[in-house]
Protein backbone atom coordinates (compact mmCIF):
# COMPACT_ATOMS: atom_id res chain seq x y z
CA UNK A 1 0.00 0.00 0.00
CA UNK A 2 1.32 3.42 -0.92
CA UNK A 3 2.21 5.57 2.05
CA UNK A 4 1.27 9.23 1.75
CA UNK A 5 -0.77 12.08 3.13
CA UNK A 6 -4.41 11.37 3.77
CA UNK A 7 -6.10 14.42 2.22
CA UNK A 8 -9.37 13.77 3.99
CA UNK A 9 -7.78 13.83 7.46
CA UNK A 10 -5.65 16.95 6.84
CA UNK A 11 -8.56 19.13 5.76
CA UNK A 12 -9.53 21.85 8.20
CA UNK A 13 -12.99 22.47 9.50
CA UNK A 14 -15.36 24.11 7.08
CA UNK A 15 -17.14 27.34 7.95
CA UNK A 16 -14.32 28.98 9.96
CA UNK A 17 -14.48 32.73 9.40
CA UNK A 18 -11.36 34.79 8.83
CA UNK A 19 -10.73 37.31 11.56
CA UNK A 20 -11.70 40.75 10.24
CA UNK A 21 -9.83 43.87 11.34
CA UNK A 22 -11.71 47.16 11.41
CA UNK A 23 -9.85 49.46 8.95
CA UNK A 24 -10.80 52.55 10.99
CA UNK A 25 -8.47 51.45 13.80
CA UNK A 26 -5.53 52.34 11.52
CA UNK A 27 -6.85 55.80 10.65
CA UNK A 28 -6.83 59.27 12.25
CA UNK A 29 -9.23 62.20 11.96
CA UNK A 30 -7.89 65.59 10.79
CA UNK A 31 -9.74 68.94 10.83
CA UNK A 32 -9.99 70.92 7.56
CA UNK A 33 -9.52 74.69 7.91
CA UNK A 34 -10.78 77.20 5.31
CA UNK A 35 -8.65 80.27 4.38
CA UNK A 36 -9.24 83.93 5.22
CA UNK A 37 -12.01 85.22 2.87
CA UNK A 38 -14.60 82.79 4.27
CA UNK A 39 -16.57 83.39 7.48
CA UNK A 40 -16.59 79.76 8.71
CA UNK A 41 -13.09 78.35 9.20
CA UNK A 42 -13.95 74.81 10.39
CA UNK A 43 -15.00 73.02 7.20
CA UNK A 44 -15.14 69.46 8.50
CA UNK A 45 -13.07 66.33 9.11
CA UNK A 46 -11.12 63.95 6.89
CA UNK A 47 -9.66 60.47 7.44
CA UNK A 48 -6.16 59.29 6.65
CA UNK A 49 -4.07 56.20 7.43
CA UNK A 50 -1.82 56.67 10.45
CA UNK A 51 1.91 57.22 9.84
CA UNK A 52 3.63 53.83 9.59
CA UNK A 53 7.20 53.28 8.46
CA UNK A 54 7.97 55.29 5.32
CA UNK A 55 4.31 56.17 4.70
CA UNK A 56 3.68 59.62 6.19
CA UNK A 57 0.11 60.74 6.93
CA UNK A 58 0.97 64.39 6.13
CA UNK A 59 2.13 63.47 2.62
CA UNK A 60 -1.13 61.59 2.01
CA UNK A 61 -3.16 64.63 3.09
CA UNK A 62 -1.29 67.27 1.07
CA UNK A 63 -2.93 67.86 -2.28
CA UNK A 64 -6.35 66.59 -1.21
CA UNK A 65 -9.21 68.61 -2.70
CA UNK A 66 -12.48 69.03 -0.82
CA UNK A 67 -15.71 70.48 -2.20
CA UNK A 68 -17.82 72.61 0.15
CA UNK A 69 -21.03 74.57 -0.34
CA UNK A 70 -20.48 78.32 -0.16
CA UNK A 71 -23.65 78.55 1.96
CA UNK A 72 -21.88 76.56 4.71
CA UNK A 73 -18.75 78.71 4.49
CA UNK A 74 -20.67 82.01 4.62
CA UNK A 75 -23.65 80.94 6.79
CA UNK A 76 -25.97 82.27 4.07
CA UNK A 77 -28.46 80.07 2.20
CA UNK A 78 -28.46 82.50 -0.76
CA UNK A 79 -25.09 81.00 -1.79
CA UNK A 80 -26.33 77.38 -1.71
CA UNK A 81 -26.00 76.96 -5.51
CA UNK A 82 -22.24 77.61 -5.49
CA UNK A 83 -19.58 75.03 -4.63
CA UNK A 84 -16.06 75.97 -3.51
CA UNK A 85 -13.07 73.68 -4.00
CA UNK A 86 -10.31 73.87 -1.37
CA UNK A 87 -6.88 72.21 -1.63
CA UNK A 88 -4.87 71.04 1.40
CA UNK A 89 -1.45 72.72 1.17
CA UNK A 90 -0.04 72.22 4.69
CA UNK A 91 -0.68 70.09 7.79
CA UNK A 92 -0.11 71.61 11.24
CA UNK A 93 -0.69 69.06 14.00
CA UNK A 94 -4.23 67.75 13.43
CA UNK A 95 -5.25 70.71 11.23
CA UNK A 96 -5.22 70.73 7.41
CA UNK A 97 -4.62 74.27 6.10
CA UNK A 98 -6.33 74.80 2.74
CA UNK A 99 -6.25 77.36 -0.06
CA UNK A 100 -8.81 78.33 -2.73
CA UNK A 101 -8.72 75.89 -5.68
CA UNK A 102 -11.85 76.69 -7.69
CA UNK A 103 -15.55 77.50 -7.81
CA UNK A 104 -18.51 75.97 -9.64
CA UNK A 105 -22.29 76.13 -9.90
CA UNK A 106 -24.59 73.23 -9.07
CA UNK A 107 -26.10 71.59 -12.15
CA UNK A 108 -29.68 72.23 -11.01
CA UNK A 109 -29.02 75.99 -10.74
CA UNK A 110 -27.49 76.13 -14.24
CA UNK A 111 -30.44 74.23 -15.73
CA UNK A 112 -32.94 76.51 -13.99
CA UNK A 113 -31.35 79.61 -15.56
CA UNK A 114 -31.72 78.43 -19.18
CA UNK A 115 -35.17 79.38 -20.50
CA UNK A 116 -36.98 80.03 -23.76
CA UNK A 117 -37.30 83.40 -25.55
CA UNK A 118 -33.92 84.74 -24.37
CA UNK A 119 -30.29 84.69 -25.54
CA UNK A 120 -27.56 82.97 -23.54
CA UNK A 121 -24.12 84.65 -23.71
CA UNK A 122 -20.97 82.95 -22.41
CA UNK A 123 -17.35 84.06 -22.14
CA UNK A 124 -14.16 82.68 -20.62
CA UNK A 125 -10.89 84.43 -19.81
CA UNK A 126 -7.50 83.04 -18.76
CA UNK A 127 -5.76 85.53 -16.50
CA UNK A 128 -2.80 85.71 -14.09
CA UNK A 129 -3.26 87.31 -10.66
CA UNK A 130 -0.68 89.58 -9.04
CA UNK A 131 0.57 86.65 -6.90
CA UNK A 132 1.19 84.51 -10.05
CA UNK A 133 -1.86 82.21 -9.96
CA UNK A 134 -3.01 81.30 -13.48
CA UNK A 135 -6.81 80.95 -13.46
CA UNK A 136 -9.62 80.63 -15.99
CA UNK A 137 -12.94 82.33 -15.30
CA UNK A 138 -16.19 81.36 -17.06
CA UNK A 139 -18.99 83.94 -17.19
CA UNK A 140 -22.65 83.46 -18.11
CA UNK A 141 -25.38 86.03 -18.87
CA UNK A 142 -28.95 86.12 -20.22
CA UNK A 143 -30.86 88.84 -22.03
CA UNK A 144 -34.02 90.30 -20.51
CA UNK A 145 -36.93 92.48 -21.60
CA UNK A 146 -36.46 96.20 -22.02
CA UNK A 147 -38.72 98.54 -20.02
CA UNK A 148 -42.24 98.79 -21.58
CA UNK A 149 -41.42 96.03 -24.10
CA UNK A 150 -44.45 94.34 -25.68
CA UNK A 151 -42.57 91.74 -27.74
CA UNK A 152 -42.42 88.30 -26.10
CA UNK A 153 -38.88 87.36 -27.16
CA UNK A 154 -35.62 89.01 -26.04
CA UNK A 155 -33.20 87.74 -28.67
CA UNK A 156 -30.02 89.80 -29.14
CA UNK A 157 -28.43 90.32 -32.56
CA UNK A 158 -25.06 88.73 -33.39
CA UNK A 159 -23.31 92.12 -33.28
CA UNK A 160 -24.80 92.81 -29.84
CA UNK A 161 -23.70 89.38 -28.56
CA UNK A 162 -20.13 90.04 -29.76
CA UNK A 163 -20.11 93.49 -28.14
CA UNK A 164 -21.42 92.10 -24.83
CA UNK A 165 -18.87 89.26 -24.87
CA UNK A 166 -16.06 91.75 -25.53
CA UNK A 167 -17.26 93.84 -22.61
CA UNK A 168 -17.43 90.77 -20.36
CA UNK A 169 -13.87 89.67 -21.17
CA UNK A 170 -12.50 93.20 -20.64
CA UNK A 171 -14.13 93.56 -17.22
CA UNK A 172 -13.06 90.08 -16.05
CA UNK A 173 -9.49 90.70 -17.28
CA UNK A 174 -9.32 94.06 -15.50
CA UNK A 175 -10.83 92.88 -12.22
CA UNK A 176 -8.86 89.60 -11.95
CA UNK A 177 -5.41 90.75 -13.11
CA UNK A 178 -5.23 93.67 -10.66
CA UNK A 179 -5.58 91.66 -7.44
CA UNK A 180 -4.30 88.60 -5.56
CA UNK A 181 -6.15 85.27 -5.43
CA UNK A 182 -7.50 86.09 -1.95
CA UNK A 183 -8.80 89.48 -3.11
CA UNK A 184 -10.38 87.83 -6.17
CA UNK A 185 -12.12 85.30 -3.92
CA UNK A 186 -13.50 88.22 -1.89
CA UNK A 187 -14.91 89.68 -5.13
CA UNK A 188 -16.43 86.36 -6.24
CA UNK A 189 -18.43 85.80 -3.03
CA UNK A 190 -20.69 88.91 -3.33
CA UNK A 191 -20.81 88.71 -7.20
CA UNK A 192 -19.00 92.05 -7.70
CA UNK A 193 -17.83 91.18 -11.24
CA UNK A 194 -21.30 90.00 -12.35
CA UNK A 195 -22.93 93.25 -11.19
CA UNK A 196 -20.24 95.30 -12.95
CA UNK A 197 -20.89 93.45 -16.25
CA UNK A 198 -24.65 93.93 -15.90
CA UNK A 199 -24.24 97.67 -15.28
CA UNK A 200 -21.77 98.31 -18.14
CA UNK A 201 -23.78 96.43 -20.82
CA UNK A 202 -27.08 98.27 -20.26
CA UNK A 203 -26.42 100.44 -23.33
CA UNK A 204 -25.97 97.39 -25.60
CA UNK A 205 -28.74 95.11 -24.32
CA UNK A 206 -30.20 94.68 -20.79
CA UNK A 207 -28.93 91.53 -19.05
CA UNK A 208 -30.04 89.39 -16.10
CA UNK A 209 -28.58 86.47 -14.13
CA UNK A 210 -24.98 87.53 -14.84
CA UNK A 211 -22.63 85.23 -12.91
CA UNK A 212 -19.06 83.96 -12.82
CA UNK A 213 -20.30 80.37 -13.00
CA UNK A 214 -16.91 78.65 -12.80
CA UNK A 215 -13.35 79.37 -11.70
CA UNK A 216 -10.62 76.90 -12.64
CA UNK A 217 -7.10 77.04 -11.18
CA UNK A 218 -4.65 76.14 -13.96
CA UNK A 219 -1.26 76.82 -12.37
CA UNK A 220 -0.03 77.74 -8.90
CA UNK A 221 3.22 79.52 -7.97
CA UNK A 222 5.90 78.00 -5.76
CA UNK A 223 4.48 77.09 -2.35
CA UNK A 224 4.94 79.83 0.26
CA UNK A 225 4.29 78.72 3.85
CA UNK A 226 4.33 82.29 5.19
CA UNK A 227 1.59 83.40 2.77
CA UNK A 228 -0.56 80.38 3.69
CA UNK A 229 -0.11 81.07 7.41
CA UNK A 230 -1.18 84.69 6.82
CA UNK A 231 -4.37 83.43 5.13
CA UNK A 232 -5.16 81.36 8.21
CA UNK A 233 -4.34 84.16 10.64
CA UNK A 234 -1.15 82.55 11.90
CA UNK A 235 2.35 84.01 11.79
CA UNK A 236 5.12 81.97 10.21
CA UNK A 237 7.76 83.55 12.42
CA UNK A 238 8.07 83.47 16.20
CA UNK A 239 6.87 86.60 18.01
CA UNK A 240 9.69 88.47 19.69
CA UNK A 241 9.12 90.16 23.03
CA UNK A 242 9.95 93.76 23.87
CA UNK A 243 13.12 94.64 25.72
CA UNK A 244 12.47 95.48 29.37
CA UNK A 245 14.86 97.95 31.02
CA UNK A 246 15.22 97.83 34.78
CA UNK A 247 17.66 99.36 37.20
CA UNK A 248 20.31 96.91 38.32
CA UNK A 249 20.47 96.41 42.08
CA UNK A 250 23.37 94.49 43.54
CA UNK A 251 22.24 91.93 46.04
CA UNK A 252 24.13 91.89 49.35
CA UNK A 253 24.41 88.49 50.98
CA UNK A 254 23.95 88.39 54.73
CA UNK A 255 26.92 87.16 56.72
CA UNK A 256 26.44 83.80 58.38
UniProtKB/Swiss-Prot annotation:
GO terms for molecular function: structural constituent of ribosome. Belongs to the eukaryotic ribosomal protein eS1 family. It comes from the Eukaryota. The modification N-acetylalanine is found at residue 2. Pfam families: Ribosomal_S3Ae. GO terms for cellular component: cytosolic small ribosomal subunit. It is found in: Cytoplasm. InterPro entries: Ribosomal_eS1, Ribosomal_eS1_CS, Ribosomal_eS1_euk. Keywords: Acetylation, Cytoplasm, Ribonucleoprotein, Ribosomal protein. GO terms for biological process: translation. Its main location: cytoplasm. The gene is RPS1. This is Small ribosomal subunit protein eS1. Component of the small ribosomal subunit. Mature ribosomes consist of a small (40S) and a large (60S) subunit. The 40S subunit contains about 33 different proteins and 1 molecule of RNA (18S). The 60S subunit contains about 49 different proteins and 3 molecules of RNA (25S, 5.8S and 5S). PANTHER family: 40S RIBOSOMAL PROTEIN S3A.
Amino acid sequence: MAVGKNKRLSKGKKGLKKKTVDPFTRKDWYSIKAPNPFNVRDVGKTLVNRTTGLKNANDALKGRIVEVSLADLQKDEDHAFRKVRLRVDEVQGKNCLTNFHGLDFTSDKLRSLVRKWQTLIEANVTVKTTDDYLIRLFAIAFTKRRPNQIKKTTYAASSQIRAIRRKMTDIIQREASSCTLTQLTSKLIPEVIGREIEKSTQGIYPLQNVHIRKVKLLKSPKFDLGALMALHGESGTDDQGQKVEREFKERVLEEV
